[in-house]
Amino acid sequence: MSRPRVFFDITIAGKPTGRIVMELYNDIVPKTAENFRALCTGEKGVGKSGKPLHFKGSKFHRIIPEFMIQGGDFTRGNGTGGESIYGEKFPDENFKEKHTGPGVLSMANAGPNTNGSQFFLCTVKTAWLDGKHVVFGRVVEGLDIVSKVEGNGSSSGTPKSECLIADCGQL
C-alpha cells in the first residue's frame, strides 16, 4: 500500500510562496491520515458547521518560530474551530510515531481524544509532544516553504503576515 501524498500551495501576504508536499502515514494511523487527505481534497462537501470540509482558503493562525506552524481551523480561522470528516472530534488513534524533527505533521488538540481538523508542522524536534499528539505524516518537499511560514511567526504565535493555504489537494 503506497502512502498518499498531499500538497498545500502557500501564499504569504498575498504573494505565492511555494508548495509543501506531505506524505501521510495511512499504514500507521489510517483514520487520522484519511481525515487530513480528505480535508486537502475537499471531497466530503460541507460539514456540520455549514462550512466546506476543506483546507483551501484557510490560514496558519498560530506560528511560533523554533517550534511549529499550526493551521486547519477552516470554520473560525483563529484556533477555536475546525471539524473532522467524522463529525466534530475523533479519538487519538495511536502514538507510534514521534515528533523527531522538522517537517513532522501532527494533530493539534485540546486534550486526549479531541482531534478535529487542526494540525501542526514541526520546525524542530518536539519530544515533549510525544504521547499527547498523533503524528500522521511528514513533509517530503517544501521544507523551505515551511521555514518561510515560520519566519512570519512570533513568540505569542500571532502571525506577522497572513500565511494562507491558497490551494491544496492530493498528488
Swiss-Prot record:
Residue span(s) of domain PPIase cyclophilin-type: 7-170
Catalytic activity: [protein]-peptidylproline (omega=180) = [protein]-peptidylproline (omega=0)
Enzyme Commission designation: 5.2.1.8
One record GO biological process: protein folding
Top EC category: isomerase
One Gene Ontology term, aspect cellular component: cytoplasm
Record's function text: PPIases accelerate the folding of proteins. It catalyzes the cis-trans isomerization of proline imidic peptide bonds in oligopeptides.
Protein name: Peptidyl-prolyl cis-trans isomerase 7
Organism of provenance: Caenorhabditis elegans
This protein's encoding gene: cyn-7
